[in-house]
UniProtKB/Swiss-Prot annotation:
It holds the Pfam family CsbD. Residues 18-41 are annotated as: Disordered. InterPro entries: CsbD, UPF0337_stress_rsp, YjbJ_sf. Residues 23-41 have a biased composition (Basic and acidic residues). PANTHER family: UPF0337 PROTEIN YJBJ (PTHR34977:SF1). It comes from the Bacteria. This is UPF0337 protein SAOUHSC_01730. Belongs to the UPF0337 (CsbD) family. The lineage of its organism: Bacteria, Bacillati, Bacillota, Bacilli, Bacillales.
């Protein structure tokens, strides 16, 4: 999942840059949305990992 979130962020960055260079506001906005989606996935994954770690520590 971490790879997917990083890929979404990378893809979004590329789209945003290309949109900016070509003055394509729609592509630029799409890139911003992809980056935000990737970041959200990363935050959720990190939270899940922290919760899992906390549960594992409580079990010991």
């Amino acid at each position: 999942m971490a790879d997917e979130s990083k890929f979404d962020q990378f893809k979004g960055n590329v789209k945003e840059t290309v949109g900016n260079v070509t003055d394509n506001k729609e592509l630029e906005k799409e890139g911003q949305q992809d980056k935000a989606t990737g970041k959200a996935k990363e935050v959720v994954e990190n939270a899940k990992n922290k919760i899992t770690d906390a549960i594992d520590k409580l079990k010991k």
